[in-house]
Amino acid sequence: MANVSMRDMLQAGVHFGHQTRYWNPKMKPFIFGARNKVHIINLEKTVPLFNNALNYIGSVASKKGKILFVGTKRAASDSVRDAAVKCDQFYVNKRWLGGMLTNWKTVRQSIKRLKDLEQQSQDGTFDKITKKEVLMLQREMAKLENSLGGIKNMGGLPDCLFVVDADHEHIAITEARNLGIPVVSIVDTNSNPDGVDYIIPGNDDAIRAVQLYLNSAADAVIEGREKNIEVQAEEGEFVEAAE
């Protein structure tokens, strides 16, 4: 599994936390010190924790598990989508709708509505109704795509969440926790690490840092999937040899 080095993290600014006055005391074990009233994260703690989290994500992917990338703030939104698309996984990058996991039955109905509208827009149904009706349906479709587009093909609850900002996405983490879904999350010095199974202490605002986390996670998923294919191929060879 590809490992991320301390040099990579330093260059991306992973070690810069928040201003000291905003800190969460529960993050004390992961803080090296402070400089100019800004907490410095101890990368000697972060590096092994991050690589352990990547190994876990890779193992989920190797078992064909579904990974949901979550990051709805502006600094993370595009990178979250790009990473999920890169490794053929799922994402929420605009707004976390309350109950997205805990009320999956209702979410599934909304996804069905989105897919029905997509079908209607392609099969000629829109040609048979008024322009005003088409406009209303297009707006509804765009709204649904905006909030559910990244999970419309998930086909059920995810096996794991990869969260960019534990503080900003606390509702998603709580829902996952209630359902027993493991959570991997970037946790900055102002955040509460409770409820996170795989804590990655690090800067959750710098775009370069966010991209480092997400690209590494996407690569771990891809490697995990490839490992699964290799194992299946080997098992196939054993079966042939036995015959």
Swiss-Prot record:
One of its GO terms (molecular function) is structural constituent of ribosome. One of its GO terms (biological process) is translation. GO terms for cellular component: cytosolic small ribosomal subunit. InterPro entries: Ribosomal_uS2 (IPR001865), Ribosomal_uS2_bac/mit/plastid (IPR005706), Ribosomal_uS2_CS (IPR018130), Ribosomal_uS2_flav_dom_sf (IPR023591). Disulfide bonds: none annotated. The keyword Ribosomal protein applies. It comes from the Bacteria. Keywords: Ribonucleoprotein, Ribosomal protein. It holds the Pfam family Ribosomal_S2. PANTHER family: 30S RIBOSOMAL PROTEIN S2 PROKARYOTIC AND ORGANELLAR (PTHR12534), SMALL RIBOSOMAL SUBUNIT PROTEIN US2M (PTHR12534:SF0). Belongs to the universal ribosomal protein uS2 family. This is Small ribosomal subunit protein uS2. It comes from Pseudoalteromonas atlantica (strain T6c / ATCC BAA-1087). The gene is rpsB.
